[in-house]
Amino acid sequence: MAKKEMVEFDEAIHGEDLAKFIKEASDHKLKISGYNELIKDIRIRAKDELGVDGKMFNRLLALYHKDNRDVFEAETEEVVELYDTVFSK
């Protein structure tokens, strides 16, 4: 596989394209901000309507979204086992 040649930024040549990339990325950040507000509203509803703490909601959301329950369980179990070993009375 051939190495890709590095491009050196030249404002005169690449400036307009860079501005387009920045504007495109900014548009995506604006959408993300909007979605984050929607998630915040859902988290508040879960707290108000179901009594679920916001921190717990966030942890469950991350666990569900990343679909890594097994990894989380294994890591948590490992930490608890080590804790019990180190701090056993």
Swiss-Prot record:
This protein is called Double-stranded DNA-binding protein
Domain of life, per lineage: Viruses
Work out whether the entry's keyword set contains DNA-binding.
yes
Asked if the record carries the keyword DNA-binding, the reply is: yes
The record's listing under InterPro entries reads:
Double-stranded_DNA-bd
Q: What does this protein do?
A: May play a role in transcription of several T4 genes. Binds double-stranded DNA and interacts preferentially with T4 late promoter regions.
Q: GO molecular function of the protein, one example?
A: DNA binding
State how it assembles.
Homodimer.
**Alphabetical keyword list:** DNA replication, DNA-binding
Name of the gene encoding the protein in the UniProt record? dsbA
A GO BP entry is: DNA replication
